[in-house]
Amino acid sequence: MCAERLGQFVTLALVFATLDPAQGTDSTNPPEGPQDRSSQQKGRLSLQNTAEIQHCLVNAGDVGCGVFECFENNSCEIQGLHGICMTFLHNAGKFDAQGKSFIKDALRCKAHALRHKFGCISRKCPAIREMVFQLQRECYLKHDLCSAAQENVGVIVEMIHFKDLLLHEPYVDLVNLLLTCGEDVKEAVTRSVQAQCEQSWGGLCSILSFCTSNIQRPPTAAPEHQPLADRAQLSRPHHRDTDHHLTANRGAKGERGSKSHPNAHARGRTGGQSAQGPSGSSEWEDEQSEYSDIRR
């Protein structure tokens, strides 16, 4: 129930977030105000923004956060790249040698890739956003984000702020990658985000965490039960065969009636008690009892 409602809420939010404001306007009545014209261009980067970003990228170097600042305040609303860069640089002194090397190499990788790929991509906002996030993921994985996070868990947790996850998609992408870096990193990041969420939203975070735990909870039926059931089904034909032999033997002995010796009945009971053993041994004992009755 929680998962269904949460899914409906997220779907509705995404629909409103991606809805084109210009959809449904009549082509014979173009918008007159500058706000209407800008709303029509939400789906693609304006020519002015494109020229400004390209000029900014040419002047920015690979070192520092200048390249990422070029993507702030544009019509595609790509926010957060510059903030992540500044956060890494401000906390670089808290990392060990491996972490510092990761920060330097990953930021340089992202800056170099953005500068060379931006001129080759479409001006459509979804294409630009996908290009930005794909390059970010590639650089994080190429320079081993998980190793740096595992050796610097405390610093990584300090860098993550709940409000950034609500406002900037690059932060969400970074946290999603961190959640794949082993149980220690995953637990620390989850605990930190949960605590910050409860400070901001209160009891709503507890409801969301309850829904998430229900979604991720494994099935109650243990997998070991199935092989036991299969073994029980396989053993039933054997028991039916054994019962059939015992019934036939008892019928044959009943027909002989008074001709049978009391010792023969004792041997028959002994054979019945050992029916759980191999069927060949039971049949051999029955044949011996019949031969004994004939001799008598």
Curated annotation (Swiss-Prot):
UniProt KW keywords: Disulfide bond, Glycoprotein, Hormone, Secreted, Signal
Family per similarity comment: Belongs to the stanniocalcin family.
Biased composition (Polar residues): 24-44
Compartments, as annotated in UniProt: Secreted
Organism of origin: Mus musculus
Higher taxonomy: Eukaryota, Metazoa, Chordata, Craniata, Vertebrata
Described purpose of this protein according to its UniProt entry: Has an anti-hypocalcemic action on calcium and phosphate homeostasis.
Carbohydrate attachment residues: N73
Organ and tissue specificity: Found in a variety of tissues including skeletal muscle, small intestine, kidney, liver and brain.
Subunit field text: Homodimer; disulfide-linked.
Annotated region (Disordered), positions in chain: 21-44, 218-296
A GO term, aspect molecular function: enzyme binding
InterPro entries xref list: Stanniocalcin
GO cellular component, one term: perinuclear region of cytoplasm
Compositional bias segments (type: Basic and acidic residues): 240-258
Signal peptide location: 1-24
PANTHER family for this protein: STANNIOCALCIN, STANNIOCALCIN-2
Gene Ontology biological-process annotations: calcium ion homeostasis; cellular response to hypoxia; decidualization; embryo implantation; endoplasmic reticulum unfolded protein response; intracellular calcium ion homeostasis; negative regulation of gene expression; negative regulation of multicellular organism growth
Compositional bias annotation for Low complexity: 272-282
Name assigned to this protein: Stanniocalcin-2
